[in-house]
Amino acid sequence: MSDKNSFLVFSGTNSRYLAEKICASLGCPLGNLVVTKFSDGEFGVSFEESIRGRDVFLVQSTFPNSDNLMELLLMIDAAKRASARNIIAVVPYFGWARQDRKDKPRVSIGAKLVADLLSVAGIDRLITMDLHADQIQGFFDVPVDHLYASGVILPYLQSLRLKDMVIASPDVGGSKRANTYAKYFGCPLVLCNKTRARANVVASMQIIGDVKDKNVVIIDDMVDTAGTITKAADIMKQAGAKTVRACASHCVMSGPASERVQNSALEEIVFTDSIPYTKRCDKVKQLTIADMFAETIRRVEDRSEERRVGKECRTTCRSRWSPYH
């Protein structure tokens, strides 16, 4: 883009599929970034075009492994050293978000550490979606634009025109999120009370509420091994639910998740494309968040341009009317 005051969008390796759709929505080309991998496992990044004085948006979800976070940090560092005006990290899925507090002695708080790493690397702003805990925004010393997948999930659910709908939360911790959907549709809220034997293993689960002859929609922020959500679906079906489907923001779907979903009572499970889903499961559907992120980038850039123009006007006026001019 030739305008000196324009923005540029670049993508890490793992999120290129989404960055291309964001750029298509914005009507701009995806910037040229090269990731070089070395034989010892290290890698480096380089911008193949000038970004001096530009606002740079770096798209990269920090999943499925730590290489994606490291790649993002290197992108930020390279942008800072190349004299970018503002560096905005666009992280649709923020990994390590489940490590947001000390739930037992002598454990790390991974979410705070990752926030510190991004800040020290040099970001001026973060755009993300559906953090596991809203308070993670406070871990950053820079502005955080926290988006919600409900922007694409709600219209999809409306298009289904489900009668006798009930919104369900797979655990007590997610009740606030699920209640937002229940209020929007004006329908009852059902809770699942679960106990875990260990991480990713549900020991027992009870339903709080009536699901008999209802079309149940389970709402969650992410699905990892799918143990909780498939167990909830099976129990609700046994309790007389007409249909059970699930909607979640982030498609982590690790380990046996795809097989569990395929063999469960779920009609379908709907995700956004914050994370690429490369496995095969007939019940998985992904909705794109590209337009939502593109609009956020557009608004962030509009505000940035307003501040820049205002600053230039003030500088010009002071220079023009200075008695020392």
Predicted regions, residues:
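PRPP-associated nucleotide enzymes
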Residues: 1-310
